[in-house]
């Protein structure tokens, strides 16, 4: 820990930060245990880095909810994606490694909310992370779950995730499959070509 403050001081902020009831450990130990599982599995460096950094922004996003009677960490995945990018750039990791890890940190919460995991949502996720990365994201989820210190990932739930990913990969969707395109949107909105048209297309795609 004494050396850590000179390398990744952001990790130290998790020491003593109590989490919600789903976790036995504070943020610091949870990150280390998540990393340890990735190492035990001998998974590649980008998964290990994602594991140790995945909850890097929980300390600054922690709030206490009187309604839930527990802590919440809303947005820690989005903030963490940016923070992990800053850390890896500072440590001079390659652009490819930086992009991949920050992406995994950004999307690591997807498989934690089973009620929102639909086939359409999985397809959109694959579009966001790339089909070559989706299985690594599931591996990161496994590490995260083990790192909580609670019961291991329930087999039926993991099988459900895997089945949905396999189905989505066999029947992928893309912007090209929408029944509209940039030209039609420009005709209707009278907008000129530019980022706004892309935003509209992606917003429509998210509703598929």
Where are the regions that the model predicts?
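A glycine-rich phosphate-binding loop feature that marks nucleotide/adenosyl-phosphate handling sites
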Residues: 1, 11-16, 52-55, 100-108, ...
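Long, charged alpha-helical interface segments
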Residues: 1-38
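Short coil/loop linkers at secondary-structure junctions
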Residues: 2-4, 44, 94, 191-192
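Core structural elements
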Residues: 3-6, 109-110, 186-191
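Exposed alpha-helical structural elements
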Residues: 3-6, 33, 100, 121-124, ...
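Short linear loop/turn motifs
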Residues: 10-17, 101-103, 195-206
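Divalent metal-dependent catalytic cores for phosphoryl transfer on phosphate-bearing substrates
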Residues: 26-29, 33, 37-151
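Charged substrate- and nucleic-acid-binding regions of tRNA-handling and nucleotidyl-transfer enzymes
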Residues: 86, 90, 145-208
């Amino acid at each position: 820990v004494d050396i850590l403050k000179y390398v990744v001081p952001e990790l130290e902020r998790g020491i003593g930060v109590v989490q919600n009831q789903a976790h036995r450990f504070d943020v610091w130990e949870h990150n280390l245990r998540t990393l340890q599982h990735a190492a035990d599995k001998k998974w590649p460096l980008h998964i290990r880095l994602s594991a140790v950094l995945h909850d890097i922004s929980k300390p600054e996003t922690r709030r206490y909810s009187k309604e839930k009677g527990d802590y919440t960490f809303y947005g820690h995945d989005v903030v963490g994606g940016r923070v992990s990018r800053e850390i890896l750039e500072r440590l001079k990791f390659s652009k490819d490694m930086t992009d991949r890890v920050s992406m995994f940190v950004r999307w690591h919460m997807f498989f934690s909310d089973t009620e929102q995991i639909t086939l359409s949502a999985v397809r959109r996720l694959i579009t966001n992370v790339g089909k070559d990365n989706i299985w690594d994201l599931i591996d990161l989820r496994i590490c995260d779950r083990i790192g909580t210190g609670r019961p291991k990932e329930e087999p039926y739930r993991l099988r459900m995730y895997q089945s949905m990913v396999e189905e989505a990969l066999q029947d992928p969707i893309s912007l090209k499959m929408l029944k509209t395109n940039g030209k039609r949107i420009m005709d209707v909105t009278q907008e000129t070509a530019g980022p706004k048209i892309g935003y509209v297309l992606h917003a429509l795609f998210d509703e598929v």
